[in-house]
Amino acid sequence: MHGKVPTLQEVILELAPQTEIDLQCNEQLDSSEDEDEDEIDHLLERPQQARQAEQHKCYLIHVPCCKCELVVQLDIQSTKEELRVVQQLLMGALTVTCPLCASSK
């Protein structure tokens, strides 16, 4: 470059073909049924794990202590259906006691 701004004449483009690359692979793979089965099992596990992660979510439930009315926090991992069962139990006769009241008996 001889000036402040490059000109098209100063830019030299040389396009030369690269040497040809041999795309043939001379490697041989051992066909192992165990590896194939492991790969299939791994592929089947992933969707199942994803489904379990979707089904079992973490829920925080705040329930008053049955003796002192202090709020107790319950961390529950369950499906929505199981959470409904817990909700029905808490709305019924099931009561929760805070650690202070439980230790004082």
Curated annotation (Swiss-Prot):
InterPro entries attached to this UniProt entry: Papilloma_E7
Principal cellular location given in the protein's record: host cell
Motif range (Nuclear export signal): 83-91
Ranges for region E7 terminal domain: 1-45
ZnF endpoints (unnamed): 65-101
Subcellular location: Host cytoplasm; Host nucleus
Motif LXCXE motif per UniProt: ranges: 23-27
Post-translational modification as stated in the protein's UniProt record: Highly phosphorylated.
Domain of life: Viruses
GO MF: DNA binding; DNA-binding transcription factor activity; protein domain specific binding; zinc ion binding
Assembly description: Homodimer. Homooligomer. Interacts with host RB1; this interaction induces dissociation of RB1-E2F1 complex thereby disrupting RB1 activity. Interacts with host EP300; this interaction represses EP300 transcriptional activity. Interacts with protein E2; this interaction inhibits E7 oncogenic activity. Interacts with host TMEM173/STING; this interaction impairs the ability of TMEM173/STING to sense cytosolic DNA and promote the production of type I interferon (IFN-alpha and IFN-beta).
Alphabetical list of HAMAP family matching this protein: PPV_E7 (MF_04004)
Role according to the record: Plays a role in viral genome replication by driving entry of quiescent cells into the cell cycle. Stimulation of progression from G1 to S phase allows the virus to efficiently use the cellular DNA replicating machinery to achieve viral genome replication. E7 protein has both transforming and trans-activating activities. Induces the disassembly of the E2F1 transcription factor from RB1, with subsequent transcriptional activation of E2F1-regulated S-phase genes. Interferes with host histone deacetylation mediated by HDAC1 and HDAC2, leading to transcription activation.
Membership in a protein family: Belongs to the papillomaviridae E7 protein family.
Name recorded for this polypeptide: Protein E7
Organism per entry: Human papillomavirus 66
The organism's taxonomic lineage, starting at the top: Viruses, Monodnaviria, Shotokuvirae, Cossaviricota, Papovaviricetes
Gene: E7
